[in-house]
Design a protein with these regions (language model features):
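Positively charged n-region of N-terminal signal peptides that target proteins for export
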Residues: 1-7
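Bacterial N-terminal signal peptides
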Residues: 8-18
Length: 333
């Protein structure tokens, strides 16, 4: 079975790994809806191996050379045919540079490589294009302190109640937009004249974005995924999202965050996605990421977390058992 899996992985790698040019082909004619707007509809995959921040090995290099791509392709082929743990997000490029695959969960095991979506190589050395060094701006002192406080709280109170566990573990929300690659990282876009819907594969979170002149909801209304409004700037769909709830993030002053997304079709199979976040409670300056989403004929299937919420029941009951053992140990001292 493993031999078949390895052979299939190599085949998928050879079929799907390619380098996408940056920018739109001057001869490309964007398909349009009956309303005359660019047609962004369909299922788009974010399976890039491009890291969010630029690895130090690339220095100030913004784009990969052909030699860089050959190196990454060889490493990716080795990983996908290894039969070892599946690597999601930035695990692939880390393994290529480190020369070894580190298990995501060495205690209980993990998906193996047959579960990996075929990953894609794009030209950029980082998703962050601003700041120009390809790195996040410095964190605020407020955010650093909040992170320390949260880590200490979770150490002392890992499961006093279900609210001590993060939203994703509770299968409530994984954030929007969710930009992690290679695992439940498909989006489906549906358009009408006055609305765009973006469906995320992860948790099937859906954003319904009005395209008409309509003010944001009152500032007293806060939402996990914020309140989005969209408009067209030429052939680019622009989406502004405000009114984030404090519960949607562990960072301070989340309510002040404003995100701007820009979606531009740059080829029959390529959608350029730019994301600018102004998050003053978390970062000292705004930053911008760029990702190329690739068109796929695949469908988005049902998303399942832990049905019946049995995972949370076991987490909480397990912690109660640990508390009883600790109490019994103290009584015997």
């Amino acid at each position: 079975m493993k031999t078949i899996v390895r052979a299939c992985s190599v085949l998928f790698a050879s079929l799907f790994i390619f380098a996408t040019a940056q920018g739109q082909d001057s001869d490309y004619e964007i398909p349009r809806t009956v309303d005359g707007h660019p047609d962004l509809q369909g299922v788009w995959e974010n399976n890039t191996i491009t890291p969010v921040e630029r690895p130090d090995v690339f220095g100030d290099k913004e784009f990969l050379t052909d030699e860089d791509i050959d190196f990454l392709r060889a490493g990716l082929n080795t990983i996908e045919s290894s039969g070892e743990d599946a690597l999601f997000g930035e695990g692939v490029i880390q393994a290529i540079f480190e020369g070894e695959i580190n298990s995501y969960d060495p205690s209980t095991g993990n998906y193996d490589s047959q579960w990996m979506a075929p990953r894609t190589i794009h030209r950029r050395t980082s998703q962050i294009i601003d700041p120009p060094n390809g790195k996040f701006p410095p964190r605020t002192e407020e955010a650093i302190a909040a992170g320390r406080d949260l880590a200490e709280h979770r150490r002392l109170h890992p499961a006093d109640t279900w609210e001590d566990r993060p939203l994703g573990e509770r299968c409530l929300s994984f954030g929007a937009p969710r930009l992690s690659a290679g695992y439940n990282s498909y989006w489906q876009i549906v358009q009408s004249k006055n609305t765009v819907a973006i469906i995320q594969e992860m948790a099937h979170d859906v954003r319904i974005i009005p395209l008409v002149e309509k003010p944001h909801v009152d500032e007293s209304v806060k939402l996990w995924h914020g309140d989005s409004r969209g408009w067209w700037e030429g052939d680019t769909l622009v989406v502004e999202t405000t009114n984030y709830s404090e519960a949607s993030s562990t960072s301070p002053r989340t309510v002040e965050k404003v995100n701007i997304e820009r979606l531009t079709r740059i080829g029959n199979s390529a959608l350029q996605y730019r994301f600018t976040s102004n998050d003053p409670g978390n970062y000292s300056a705004p930053y911008t990421r760029e990702i190329v989403f690739d068109k796929t004929p695949d469908k988005i299937y049902e998303y399942a977390c832990h049905e019946g919420n049995y995972g949370m029941e076991y987490i909480l009951s397990g912690h109660r058992a640990e508390e009883r053992l600790a109490a019994e140990g103290g009584a015997n001292d």
